[in-house]
Amino acid sequence: LTGAARVSVTESFFALGGDSISAIRLVSHARRGGLYLEVRDVFRYPDPRGLAAVGVKVAAVVERLPEVGPLRATPVAQWFLEEAGPIDRFNQAVSVRPAADIDPVVIETALRSLIKRHGALRLRYACSSGLEILSPEAAPQFSLDLLDEGLGEAAASVVLSSASEGLSPSEGRMVVGVWNAAQRELLLVIHHLSIDGVSWRVLLEELALLCAGETLPSLGHGLQDWMGYLTSEAARPERIGELEYWQDQTRAQYCLPLDGVVPETENTLGNAAHHSYVLDAQHTRLVLEAPSVYRAEINDLLIAALGMALGRWSKEAGRDVGSVVIDLEGHGREPGASGLDLTQTIGWFTSLYPVRLDLDHIDIADAFAGGDSAGHVLMRSKEVLHSIPDKGLGYGVLERLNAETGLQLRAQSGAPIVFNYLGSFEQVLEHGWQLCESGLVGVEQDSGQRRQHLIDVNAILTASGAMQVGWSYPVDMIDAGVIARVAEYFGDALIALSTHCHARPLAQRWSLVDLEAGVRNRITALELGELEVLYPDMERVVALTPLQQGLVFESIALPVGAMDPYHVNLALELAGDVDPDRVTASWRSIVQRHEILRLGLPGSVQGQGVGVIRGLSHFDFRVITASETVVLEDVLEADRREGFDLCSAPLFRGRLILRGSLAPWLVISNHHVVMDGWSLSVLMKDLLDSYAGIGLGAHLAWWERAEEIALRPLDTAQAYWRSYLSECDGPCVLDLPVSGEAGSGFGEVKEVLSEALTADLLRFGRRVGITPAIVVQGAYMLVVRQLAGSNQVMIGTTRSGRSGIDPREDSGVGLYINTLPVYSEVKDNLSVGDWLSGLQQDQAEQGSYEHLALNDVQRLVPGGESGSGLFEAMYVFENYPERASSAQGAGALQARLISAFDATQYPLALQAFGAGELGLRLTYDRGRFGQEAAGHVMQQVLHILDQFRDLGSERV
């Protein structure tokens, strides 16, 4: 797909020259191999490692409308049918050669099957009724034309050139095929209403498969599905809201410097001349590789080059450069939020939309010299193109499918020039079939067909790796020498831009358009530039979740020298074949897989909910040789004293402690802002599997979840929490005197319930219809009620943040959790069962509103505005799924947890865990509780749980 001889697992598809068209083909090939991707995945995870991680093995079930009956024309087809004039011979054609001798009957049979399979190949057009997809039975029977082998080369060329005469849209004859036995070549001519560049790639692949007797890939959605979606989009308020944007693109009229030449004839195909410019393969490869330096795509560079060429032309004509307006052709397969799968669909999907490139204050001469101005033009081009909504889909929808907006858009003058980048056609197709030329071949068209633009520029990559750029123009308006000169300017601009990118790019190469929408409004372009200087290896800028922002704020506010309560560390004892080098390599692999482990929190934007993912060189793992007498608690204490610098990455580290003949320890340390407890179990399985060489499955990248949370609406969540807490009089404060034995830091009390009590509580929960988590929570809240001295009781609870909707969540690493209040007014007339059921129902309803930050919820409660917390008691029920490593036998690594430490800023926190025997861990602030008082709290919880086993209808 890219022409690269070798591709590493971390190389970007786009850095290798991939584009949006070849991305569609990549998805198609992956699906045929059993890995199901979406096109957007290629843009989000452009390297093989990333795609392998997000791909799934099960194909989605596609429900598609029948490919038959009246069909509304796509926007581009509607322009053609309404304004182009003669339509019968409007076609695209390719010439292909099978790998081996083949009976033309096999080709004919295969083409008949494809016409039956794809509705676009059965289109019929009538002026009175418009487009219609004929049923396979009603469509004309396709017959392959056989070229007389006795014809001379010149005569055969004439026959092939005139093959388009066999097309008849009014009869539904949209496909003509000619088999040239002498050359073993198949010429396919298809009416443009039925085909486009992407469709050719689909068609030729399927033709080769059918001729080889293989099964075709399953179809996605069809033209009827697509046009149903576009029609609904034309009426959608959000899409109509794009009107002003599109009007702004063409509001400043742009004219080519043609000195007022008045054409003597119409601008038709018959009156057009053509010029070809070829950029050699060596320079083309540099051009294809250059955009990645600016996190750009090839179209960004091509439009920048065309803008430079037009700017130079205008400057030489004595005109101000200003802005240039170019119509850009795209493949048009932009399903947006529709979820439509068009990777195997044939049709004319092309989108056409205006792009305004501002060249004000650009030194054109410096740009052509490859100076800083070249970088500024490329940055502007990238920013313009990446800001276009849905890659231009809406322009055609509003111009042609909505009568009101269409009148307004068509009232403005259009761009005089159109650009289309076709990418490369795969020269070697399935089963050795080959294109005879680099792409589309010339077959006669209707000479009277009207052209939409003065200049058409079409770029394509040839079989030799060169870039061929075709320029079409009206002969009576533009001199051939002028076009040749501008074509040279375009080539010079391509070389200048690639030279600039490879040799002396700008220091700031990130733009706000490089960021996901959820983080883009949290940072300015100036601040982004500062981050780029501060973090030269910056790979991504991410939005922090509400809880992450809260943890950062609290860690920063700690007094100098204070222990950070969000510093988590634990120790594992390793067994098996412990190879330090392999452990280090496995650690590196999980840090590469889970980018949140390379998070840094820049001080310059710490109040704005922004984090930076740094390069893989920022992973912290060391192998330490210690004596056999080393004390584990000393190691963990030293690690906690070392702490973390939040501004630096990583906030996650590991130490392999070798202890002579004793089992090694693996000490894992992280700031809580990086991940939650669930994530730790994921990491351990990934580490052990990686050590054993076992492949890791799909996982949800943290930035995806953070982005999804950042884009959730806040107003509905605020309304919910305001209503939920409307009867709350204020924060729930624990009214306890400081114990005489109080000290500093945190202490803990642990208890393990007997197997019998655990079983009884599980039965109680099933009888009442509540989960074990709610059983323990209810007992804890009743104790907190006593400590607070009020029937209004509120505690904080930790929500997992993993809904199960996306199966990749289960293997994701990050801080998914959020801490939010649970409020209840304990009323004596309520039964225990009803009260606990009410708690469970409330928390179930909160699932859709868990993305609001705790401090935002706090402001909705009387007294919460003062800055004091809503509650002083926390509760978490840990029920992470068990994750046994797949590694077994020789070479495997085993790990056993021997120590763990984490803390909280809340004076009282109860943690419940386990299954067969439920465990409880009460963490307490020694400044508020003594050990005896904390032990008494634990005993009260146990006492209430013991009472629950026999209760149900009794009052609270």
Q: Predicted segment positions?
A:
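A short, small/polar-residue-rich loop/turn motif at beta-strand boundaries
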Residues: 100-116, 132-171, 240-243, 362-385, ...
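A short N-terminal helical cap/helix-turn-helix that marks the beginning
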Residues: 2, 41-46, 58-59, 121-125, ...
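Non-catalytic, low-complexity flexible loops and terminal extensions
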Residues: 63-66, 159, 207-272, 321, ...
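Extended, hydrophobic beta-loop-alpha segments that form or line the acyl/peptidyl-thioester binding
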Residues: 36-40, 118, 122, 204-207, ...
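His-Asp-centered acyl/peptidyl-transfer active-site segments
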Residues: 84-91, 108, 119-120, 233-243, ...
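Acyl-group handoff/entry surfaces in thioester-processing enzymes
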Residues: 29, 67-135, 150-233, 254-259, ...
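Regions immediately C-terminal to embedded phosphopantetheine-bearing carrier domains
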Residues: 1-84, 105, 109, 221-225, ...
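Gly/Ser/Thr-rich phosphate-binding loops and adjoining beta-strand/alpha-helix segments
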Residues: 6-11, 24-28, 87-109, 170-189, ...
